[in-house]
């Protein structure tokens, strides 16, 4: 293990984090003016690719920026950043010095896109954004892109609510995290409710209460909804909770313990018992921290393990000396890169979604640590230190992270071997020519034909690919026909695939289509694909067998009418059931969301220019959508948040004739 002295990375100049909308890059970089696009043939040709790059180099200057290699279809092969674009891109023209991985990339390159930036730190941030967006095959990829949960203590109510939060941090309040998983957040919130008796209900539920709910009865809430606690006393509980989550857990415990002894001396045994239970909850939270990090404070800890060409990165999240969970990541496309390059790319992508700690501990010296720290300054709100711990609590914590990384990689490799064996057996059972790399599973969901939709989930060798999930709102007038729904979904899915990728080069054509259903669904799918002239996509329908409830058996229907079954203890059966259950879960969830939107729909939604915030303001002011419709132009103009132009738009919508 190579070690380096601890190093403080200062923010020499705050890096401005570029914001990239989902549909295109920000115009601030003037990509259209900076882009250089040179087209060539679509067959792999290293001389042709190198020629494209040489012509691009002639247009470049030694300025910082980001470059993209594109193939003949315009798909992104690679995203890179550079302090001096001209020098960096020129390196790719020396093909004899490139590793095999980059030689393959150059042979496929048919155009380049260049974006200049104000600094190398800004280029690093944009590079991470573009890698996350395009997922190029020659970049290191952070495959686990699920957002991290936080604990939110709201700051916009007299009696703040504690809750789990994911996504953009728009709500006013204090955020604590990240936590490694939803489970760790839920466990912590449950313990915090026992400790501080804070409410977890939403504001509407609280406003409607006329008596305490069950949480008050089991001593997990102080019932501010019905006045069982004053605003001042509740504020004291909130203050203690903030101190506890902010790293002052010892002081909070001592404070509660002193209050408990005082209550006992005053013979207030009921209050003493309540404080005793709160103290136990505090002890439970600290005892549940599998890692002792009292001497670390706030830090993110990363350690890497490599074996057999695979990589694992173990992350620990330490806040206030408490371990808020850990998670293992398995970056892909790491062939031919140094461990330091993999770690740097991983961290840049990781902090695209997660606010960085002011202290980032890594298990190896990173050549671009200063650059990365500078780029993360703005998101962290100040200096970011990236260092390799040498001694003390930090070193012990890093050693534990390293052990966890090795164990995680060993488990991953063992699971991959088992999974590969199951996939080979699955291919054999379903009579496929080779192990499928992309399996699409389909299901429909509706209630007596209402809010009908079709759903597709995608599975691959590494599991489910959630970014590829799709759903379709059924357009048929008569949607109580499951078979017709399945025909529509297949027609729309594969009709579009034929238009966009007729040569099947994008990797988005399935090696197997698995249908949740029986003979009827199979016939509908065959008919739909036959009308499109598609006869070479393997099809299988999975239906509950006659003894499903007792034995868990399933019947598999093939296009030629044959039926097959698997032993009840077969790993292949279990794998196929998991796939079927996943599409069922996704379809049901999407249907519920669609039904919920339909139930809560308002006539105001149809008015152009009226968003959720303005709709709420109108309903609060007038009471109902009907009263908004009946309001005069003058009444609309007096409503809060409604300008004269918006008032005129609303009035004209309901009174088209004037």
From Swiss-Prot:
Residues 250-285 form the UVR domain. Keywords: Cytoplasm, DNA damage, DNA excision, DNA repair, Excision nuclease, SOS response. Its main location: cytoplasm. Residues 62-140 form the GIY-YIG domain. It comes from the Bacteria. GO terms for cellular component: cytoplasm; excinuclease repair complex. GO terms for molecular function: DNA binding; excinuclease ABC activity. The keyword Hydrolase does not apply. One of its GO terms (biological process) is nucleotide-excision repair. Pfam families: GIY-YIG, HHH_5, UVR, UvrC_RNaseH, UvrC_RNaseH_dom. It is found in: Cytoplasm. The UvrABC repair system catalyzes the recognition and processing of DNA lesions. UvrC both incises the 5' and 3' sides of the lesion. The N-terminal half is responsible for the 3' incision and the C-terminal half is responsible for the 5' incision. Belongs to the UvrC family. PANTHER family: UVRABC SYSTEM PROTEIN C, UVRC/OXIDOREDUCTASE. Interacts with UvrB in an incision complex. This is UvrABC system protein C. It comes from Novosphingobium aromaticivorans (strain ATCC 700278 / DSM 12444 / CCUG 56034 / CIP 105152 / NBRC 16084 / F199).
